[in-house]
């Protein structure tokens, strides 16, 4: 069975054409810097919304196909690739589910962008404590029982953020 990789294949086809970089990002495929060879190779694939590569802000071709494959893989209705990393995803998720005064359950050791989004939207956080993992000497997941208890105490909750 051949796996489908529409975005990867489009990037490979683009790079094989050895195009001149007259667009952002400014590293120009790694050519104008003294970076290690392997990193320069990776930068060949760091391209923006160019012909044949689709557009993350409005996918209609290879990115749309890749997002559909990802959704299918995880049994989700839809899947979205993010621009600007996890921060934009956390902001979008909280803005889409909460408004001022809404209750949101949040893992106490979540990414700082989660707390930023909660503050920006004006939601009211209910903090969920993660278990301490003695093996790794770090915070682990929030126990299921903790989540159930929080939902009982605050049935008005609009969203829950568990990031680890």
Question: What is the predicted role of each segment?
Answer:
Residues 65-69, 89-93, 113, 142-149:
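Well-ordered alpha-helical segments embedded in enzymatic catalytic cores
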Residues 106-123:
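Substrate-binding/gating loop at the entrance of the active-site cleft, primarily
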Residues 1-61:
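N-terminal "arm"/small-domain region of PLP-dependent enzymes with the aminotransferase-like
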Residues 107-108, 127-132:
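Short beta->alpha connector loops at strand-helix junctions that form conserved
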Residues 136-164:
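Active-site phosphate-binding strand-loop segment of PLP-dependent enzymes
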């Amino acid at each position: 069975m051949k796996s489908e990789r529409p975005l990867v294949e489009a990037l490979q086809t683009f790079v094989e054409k050895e195009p001149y970089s007259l667009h952002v990002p400014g590293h120009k495929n790694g050519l104008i810097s003294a970076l290690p060879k392997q990193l320069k190779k990776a930068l060949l694939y760091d391209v923006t919304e160019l012909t044949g590569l689709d557009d993350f802000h409005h996918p209609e071709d290879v990115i749309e196909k890749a997002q559909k494959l990802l959704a299918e893989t995880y049994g989700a209705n839809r899947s979205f690739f993010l621009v600007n990393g996890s921060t934009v995803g956390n902001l979008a998720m909280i803005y889409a589910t909460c408004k001022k005064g809404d209750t949101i359950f949040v893992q106490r050791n979540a990414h700082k962008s989660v707390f930023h989004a909660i503050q920006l939207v004006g939601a009211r956080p209910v903090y969920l404590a993660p278990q301490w993992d003695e093996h790794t000497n770090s915070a682990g997941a929030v126990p299921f029982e903790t989540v159930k208890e929080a939902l009982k105490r605050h049935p008005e909750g609009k969203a829950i953020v568990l990031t680890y």
